[in-house]
From Swiss-Prot:
Keywords: Cytoplasm, Methyltransferase, rRNA processing, S-adenosyl-L-methionine, Transferase. It is an enzyme of class 2 (transferase). It comes from the Bacteria. This is Ribosomal RNA large subunit methyltransferase H. Belongs to the RNA methyltransferase RlmH family. The keyword Ribonucleoprotein does not apply.
Length: 155
């Protein structure tokens, strides 16, 4: 199985890097994980930022037309761990078994981006720093694999 995380910016603090790498190493037992970091554009107005960065994402995601694209969007349907696991499990059972998780820019996705035919998932209605969310996403991916394989995982 191939999993990609497309996101903006780099992890810049050692504790973020170490935490993410811990989960990435754990995930490697079950899937190939690749992180694609995009440079976020900052202009003066939030709406301009949303449009520029969302257009960059739309263009970048064209290369992954054979993947299921899942946008992590706080305003979308909340998924439980089990529901999230089902997304991964359903893709694992497909021949292509390719998923791209998209973490949007700091100003959020543009309306144009949200109108694309991508699955949208939320882990809740709280606002998190992007670097921390990347770790939480990796942890949930790892947890999903543990559940799918009936392996114990400390709760």
């Amino acid at each position: 199985m191939n999993i990609k995380i497309v996101c903006f910016g780099k992890l810049d603090k050692k504790f973020f890097i170490d935490s993410f790498n811990e989960y990435a190493n754990r995930i490697s037992k079950y899937a190939n994980l690749q992180v694609i970091e995009l440079k976020e554009e900052y202009q003066k107005e939030d709406v301009v930022n949303k449009n520029i960065n969302s257009d960059l994402l739309i263009d970048k995601l064209k290369a992954f037309s054979d993947h299921e694209i899942i946008c992590m969007d706080v305003s979308s349907k909340n998924y439980s761990t089990e529901e999230f696991m089902s997304i991964i499990e359903n893709n694992k059972n497909l021949k292509q078994a390719k998923i791209v998780f998209v973490i949007g820019p700091s100003d959020g996705f543009s309306d144009k981006f949200l109108q694309q035919n991508y699955k949208k998932v939320s882990f809740g209605n709280i606002t998190l720093p992007h670097q921390l969310f990347r770790i939480i996403l990796a942890e949930q991916i790892y947890r999903a694999f543990k559940i799918m394989n009936n392996e114990k995982y400390h709760k």
